[in-house]
């Protein structure tokens, strides 16, 4: 039995299958961890969701911002933007089945025996792992609650409040929790978010750092696997922080990581999110 984690899919199914073939993935015995952003912008968002649903018993999945955007568009199609490739999912005959599965997924997963956390964007430096799991559960509970889901999805969008406070309540509380787990890149040591800067580390505003780089980050004892930040190209110097979004949908690569051995496997992608031909997966050592 092997456990793998894969970077942002964003509807790029061919590279995912290329990587799974490369490691002879067997859904009957192996496990696949997904860092979120399963859909959007790539060429096969519907097919990707259907494939994942077909192997759902082999998956651990956390939600990304594009997945939450899909759920919001499912409830209000006017949320769709011109750049989205989500309409085919909303109009699919099996849409309800796929959405019901999607909203059961987590914002943060922790594998206690391995001491590894899986999250889309990150864990803010001021939270312990325990606090992060507690607050993630608040949003996960709402996602699964038919009576509260619509209110959450309608109020999810926005950059404010940009910092956690235990005094926050209602939609504002859920929004800032969501932004930490699904949109964060740069923040201050006390967790004030900058959600405008999306490039590499050199684009950090004054006083801000990558969320994982703060020396007093309270989750340093935990290995964290995350996606979301394609501009990093998987290059993180912090020990026990694994960045897996290598920009497949932008013509980069899709990255698969063996959680136990530390091996990386990459499959190059074309500009449209399909396989770059000829497909030549590569295998790399840990932290390359």
Swiss-Prot record:
It is an enzyme of class 3 (hydrolase). It catalyses: P(1),P(4)-bis(5'-adenosyl) tetraphosphate + H2O = 2 ADP + 2 H(+). Keywords: Hydrolase. It comes from the Bacteria. CDD domains: MPP_ApaH. Transmembrane segments: none annotated. One of its GO terms (molecular function) is bis(5'-nucleosyl)-tetraphosphatase (symmetrical) activity. Its EC number is 3.6.1.41. Belongs to the Ap4A hydrolase family. Hydrolyzes diadenosine 5',5'''-P1,P4-tetraphosphate to yield ADP. This is Bis(5'-nucleosyl)-tetraphosphatase, symmetrical. The lineage of its organism: Bacteria, Pseudomonadati, Pseudomonadota, Gammaproteobacteria, Pseudomonadales.
